[in-house]
Amino acid sequence: MIREERLLKVLRAPHVSEKASTAMEKHNTIVLKVAKDATKAEIKAAVHKLFEVEVNDVRTLVVKGKTKRHGQRIGRRSDWKKAYVTLKEGQNLDFIGGAE
């Protein structure tokens, strides 16, 4: 059993993009920014506990940070982890429904 304290730290924020909204409409999949060390089991448990929905599948990927310049200084943005969480049939979770 994963501790509740850890579950609250796993999910960072919803990832809002055109691709994410299309995935929600067509495949009932939400896209989340998650902790870089989070496992698929932790992500599934956190979504189930916090949003009270049934999770069907979790797919993850690490987004590599881009190299950025500010004048002569060269820096790099941090890598971050993204999770595609597919919900079971009949389950619904809408982050941006009221943002019109």
Swiss-Prot record:
Lineage top rank: taxon: Bacteria
Recorded family membership: Belongs to the universal ribosomal protein uL23 family.
Subunit structure of this chain's protein: Part of the 50S ribosomal subunit. Contacts protein L29, and trigger factor when it is bound to the ribosome.
Listed NCBIfam families: PRK05738.1-1, PRK05738.1-3, PRK05738.2-4, PRK05738.3-2
Gene Ontology terms: cellular component: ribonucleoprotein complex; ribosome
Gene Ontology MF, one: structural constituent of ribosome
Protein name: Large ribosomal subunit protein uL23
Keywords: Ribonucleoprotein, Ribosomal protein, RNA-binding, rRNA-binding
UniProt cross-references to InterPro entries, sorted A to Z: Nucleotide-bd_a/b_plait_sf, Ribosomal_uL23-like, Ribosomal_uL23/eL15/eS24_sf, Ribosomal_uL23_CS
Pfam families: Ribosomal_L23
GO BP terms in the entry: translation
Function: One of the early assembly proteins it binds 23S rRNA. One of the proteins that surrounds the polypeptide exit tunnel on the outside of the ribosome. Forms the main docking site for trigger factor binding to the ribosome.
